[in-house]
Amino acid sequence: MIVGLGNDLIDIRRIERMLVRYGDRFVQRIFTDIEQNKSESLQKKSSSYAKRFAAKEACAKALGTGIACGVNWKDMGVINLPSGKPIMKLTNRAQMQLQKLLPLHHDAIIHLSMTDDFPWAQAFIIIEALPRG
């Protein structure tokens, strides 16, 4: 059963401007260490950061809170599996909010899709509740 759905579309140039204007302060405030390491290792840093920013926005929407209602940017982090597939890892308040969405005796699966085509980056999140066992 789907318990959450979110999407976000962002202009990569907006992230480029934030990186130029605020630099490391912006990166440290928004992105986890894993996200920073991944993005900094790529030639197109701004596209990578933009996709991850969009994924966080989409996740906050899927959780039903948005960013302003208690879920912190760093409570959500994109991790790439060895296959390259991106997944969303939740901690702290985001994890607590996820648990509130789940019916009794269900576990969550978070599906994440990210894409970019300059100047746009986009992410979709589907939160699925599956019965345990």
Swiss-Prot record:
Mg(2+) binds at D8, E57. One of its GO terms (molecular function) is holo-[acyl-carrier-protein] synthase activity. It is an enzyme of class 2 (transferase). It is found in: Cytoplasm. Gene3D superfamilies: 4'-phosphopantetheinyl transferase domain. GO terms for biological process: fatty acid biosynthetic process. Belongs to the P-Pant transferase superfamily. AcpS family. GO terms for cellular component: cytoplasm. This is Holo-[acyl-carrier-protein] synthase. It catalyses: apo-[ACP] + CoA = holo-[ACP] + adenosine 3',5'-bisphosphate + H(+).
